[in-house]
Swiss-Prot record:
<comment type="similarity">
    <text>Belongs to the GRP family.</text>
</comment>
<feature type="signal peptide">
    <location>
        <begin position="1"/>
        <end position="25"/>
    </location>
</feature>
<protein>
    <recommendedName>
        <fullName>Nodulin-16</fullName>
    </recommendedName>
</protein>
<keyword id="KW-0536">Nodulation</keyword>
<dbReference type="GO" id="GO:0009877">
    <property type="term" value="P:nodulation"/>
</dbReference>
<keyword id="KW-0732">Signal</keyword>
<keyword id="KW-0472">Membrane</keyword>
<dbReference type="GO" id="GO:0043661">
    <property type="term" value="C:peribacteroid membrane"/>
</dbReference>
Length: 109
């Protein structure tokens, strides 16, 4: 019985490793009722770009009522941002319709 439970735990952990941050981001946005639209071309372009030497990350901030708690990444201020680590340049931002136009320069927090 103990070995079966260990196998189940290892299998669940392996499944968590295969879920990408982008999918988690998309599921989070769908739960909020926001429309998430992505074409196969956009998905393929991001996958092709991520095969280079740079590591891709995804950033999902906590949606707080005050805009000051959202972070700037590169030159983008958005709900989800995928960027390279060297240099930190935003590759893709998920648009948010409720975010007003903001200045192009980030503020120091």
């Amino acid at each position: 019985m103990g070995s079966k439970m260990a196998i189940v735990i290892v299998a669940l952990f392996a499944m968590l490793l295969f879920i990408s941050p982008e999918v988690a981001c998309r599921n989070f946005k769908e739960e909020l009722g926001e429309v998430v639209k992505e074409t196969n071309e956009e998905s393929d372009a991001r996958l092709a770009g991520s095969s280079g030497g740079d590591l891709d990350k995804s950033y999902c901030p906590v949606h707080l009522p005050l805009m000051e708690y959202r972070k700037w990444i590169g030159n983008c201020r958005c709900g989800c941002c995928q960027w390279t680590t060297e240099p930190e340049v935003c590759l893709y931002c998920c648009p948010e319709s409720h975010v007003p136009d903001l200045p192009s320069r980030p503020r120091a927090y």
